[in-house]
């Protein structure tokens, strides 16, 4: 799928479910349930054991393009390449990495790095990030979107961390292109169950 088509589908959806799970089977069930509930954007994190194989299985299962499947918690270009080869449509990371940006640009795959300051947002945009992930969003609240869009009206942003059903409308009103929402189990719940 073309990079432009992926970005359009993600922004049309407006919501991306962040899937963390204890195992591959659980991750697939959560992803299927999100899609069945109408959420076509899925970010499968590389904290899931065998995440590359889960991405490959979901990419094959939904090869019709019904699911916009991304890889999350991508910390380096090696992991990004693994995810892209497995079938990920986009790459999300908790922080900006210049080499990951280069790799994603080479393959024309959208890269959405986590940024917490306007300097980080500018650096990511200059490196070709199409959408910047505001993370951790709960430290700032929706007001940060207005603050960043003041000097950077062209910035395309999506928040994660602290975005939930009670405040997602506030983020959308603030001008984000999409929101990332965590599915269950939370990272804390996952640690407890081990």
Language model feature labels by segment:
Residues 15-17, 42-44, 69-71, 91-92, ...:
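Hydrophobic faces of well-ordered beta-strands that scaffold small-molecule active sites
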Residues 77-85, 120-126, 164-177:
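Catalytic cores of alpha/beta
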Residues 46-61, 78, 93-106, 113, ...:
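Active-site-adjacent beta->alpha loops and helix N-cap segments on the catalytic face
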């Amino acid at each position: 799928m073309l990079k432009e088509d992926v970005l359009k589908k993600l922004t049309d959806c407006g919501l991306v479910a962040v899937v963390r799970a204890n195992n591959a089977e659980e991750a697939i069930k959560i992803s299927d349930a999100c899609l069945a509930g109408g959420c076509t954007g899925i970010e499968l994190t590389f904290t899931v054991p065998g995440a590359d194989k889960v991405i490959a299985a979901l990419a094959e299962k939904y090869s019709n393009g019904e699911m916009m499947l991304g890889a999350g918690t991508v910390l380096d270009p090696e992991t990004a390449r693994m995810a892209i080869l497995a079938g990920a449509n986009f790459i999300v990371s908790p922080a900006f990495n210049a080499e990951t940006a280069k790799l994603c640009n080479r393959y024309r795959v959208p890269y959405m790095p986590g940024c917490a300051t306007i300097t980080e947002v500018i650096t990511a945009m200059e490196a070709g990030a199409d959408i910047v992930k505001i993370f951790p969003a709960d430290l700032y609240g929706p007001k940060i979107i207005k603050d960043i869009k003041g000097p950077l009206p062209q910035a395309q942003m999506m928040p994660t961390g602290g975005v939930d059903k009670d405040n997602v409308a506030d983020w959308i009103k603030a001008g984000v292109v999409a929101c990332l929402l965590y599915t269950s189990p939370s990272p804390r719940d996952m640690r407890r169950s081990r």
